[in-house]
């Protein structure tokens, strides 16, 4: 299976942004294992808002010739994020969370792109989901150790129950780009 030229271009073109993201104060601290439970809880809450928007927009475009082929429900994160949010905030977690201003801008952009030029969602899909299947697994291990989490609780976001072989799944996904 050949990786598409577009997939290679995405990887190349997002490299600088990826490096810049890794060098933000929060991410660089996180990568060193310096993360507070409060900041991690907010990260999980922000992820919830982002992935809820992504999954709602991909559902709207499930019959789209490009997006319908790209998104696989095994990637969906919302249910796992809800489980994590119950762990961190309790059963009425919805009353305790709100997106940060930056997160809300990102969610607005996802919805705007979906409405105006849905094929641009491909870039968001690549950045979020493929990143979760790759570096996200490293972040899971760091969070587990830093926050002293046990038995996977609070880390369900990183679990992809419907994907047995992440590497093979990514390889197939890259051919759809």
What is each stretch, according to the model?
Residues 1-6, 29-39, 119, 152-160:
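Short, charged, low-complexity loops and linkers
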Residues 2-27, 167-171:
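Acidic, low-complexity proline/glycine-rich segments
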Residues 20-23, 50-57, 135, 139, ...:
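Amphipathic, well-ordered alpha-helical segments in soluble domains
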